[in-house]
From Swiss-Prot:
GO terms for molecular function: rRNA binding; structural constituent of ribosome. Binds 16S rRNA, required for the assembly of 30S particles and may also be responsible for determining the conformation of the 16S rRNA at the A site. One of its GO terms (cellular component) is small ribosomal subunit. Keywords: Ribonucleoprotein, Ribosomal protein, RNA-binding, rRNA-binding. This is Small ribosomal subunit protein uS14. PROSITE patterns: RIBOSOMAL_S14 (PS00527). Part of the 30S ribosomal subunit. Contacts proteins S3 and S10. Residues 1-20 are annotated as: Disordered. The gene is rpsN. The lineage of its organism: Bacteria, Pseudomonadati, Pseudomonadota, Alphaproteobacteria, Acetobacterales. One of its GO terms (biological process) is translation. Belongs to the universal ribosomal protein uS14 family.
Length: 101
């Protein structure tokens, strides 16, 4: 199991990222729009820099829903390889069968 503080920190980052998503997208659109004056674009850059860093989507780490493990995760299942193997072996994931040829 991962430290609960790390899992809670990541969940807080997810909430902040979803909250700030529209605001960040609007400011980024202003910054990238070449037709606007440089002053407006620079002001949007400063406002973007004032937003909290944890509100950025790339700060969110994909973690296992069961164990909180940060590595070897399958996005489709939101599980790490260890938890996926345990659940698949016990038949708790519908449609997932062990390969044999």
């Amino acid at each position: 199991m991962a430290k609960t503080s790390a899992v809670n920190r990541n969940k807080m980052r997810e909430r902040m990222a979803s909250r700030d998503k529209a605001k960040r997208a609007a400011l980024k659109a202003i910054v990238m729009d070449r037709s606007l004056p440089v002053e407006d674009r620079f002001e949007a850059t400063l406002r973007l820099a004032q937003l909290p860093r944890n509100g950025a989507a790339n700060r969110v780490r994909l973690r296992c829903e069961l164990t909180g493990r940060p590595r070897a995760n399958y996005r489709k299942f939101k599980l790490c390889r260890v938890a996926l193997r345990d659940l698949a072996s016990s038949g708790q994931i519908p449609g997932l069968v062990k390969a044999s040829w």
